């Protein structure tokens, strides 16, 4: 390894910055372009704000595609209706 000038900041060391700018391409070469590209493109990790999904509007026909819940008969007591045997 070549000695690095101690007066340079770490982000200005030779080889610390890629020669080309980052782009939106997700090919294998661009995914390994730099550490930031690898994290965002290769691993898919993004800490930015997430876009809101638009809710689907209900159809204009008024159909909900759901059957109404039928009324159930009143619940029957469980167990032996005459009581426990002794």
Curated annotation (Swiss-Prot):
GO-annotated molecular function: actinin binding; cyclin binding; metal ion binding; protein domain specific binding; protein serine/threonine phosphatase inhibitor activity; RNA-binding transcription regulator activity; trans-activation response element binding
Protein name (database record): Protein Tat
Disordered as annotated region, ranges: 1-21, 47-86
Sites annotated Essential for Tat translocation through the endosomal membrane: 11
Membrane spanning stretches: none
Subcellular location: Host nucleus, Host nucleolus; Host cytoplasm; Secreted
Database matches in InterPro entries: IV_Tat, Tat_dom_sf
């Amino acid at each position: 390894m070549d000695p690095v000038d101690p007066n340079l900041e770490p982000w200005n060391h030779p080889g610390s910055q890629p020669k080309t700018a980052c782009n939106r391409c997700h090919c294998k070469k661009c995914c390994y372009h730099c550490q930031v590209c690898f994290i965002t493109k290769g691993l898919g990790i993004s800490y930015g704000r997430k876009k809101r999904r638009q809710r689907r509007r209900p159809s204009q026909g008024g159909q909900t595609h759901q059957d109404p819940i039928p009324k159930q008969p009143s619940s029957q007591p469980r167990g032996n209706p005459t009581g426990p045997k002794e």
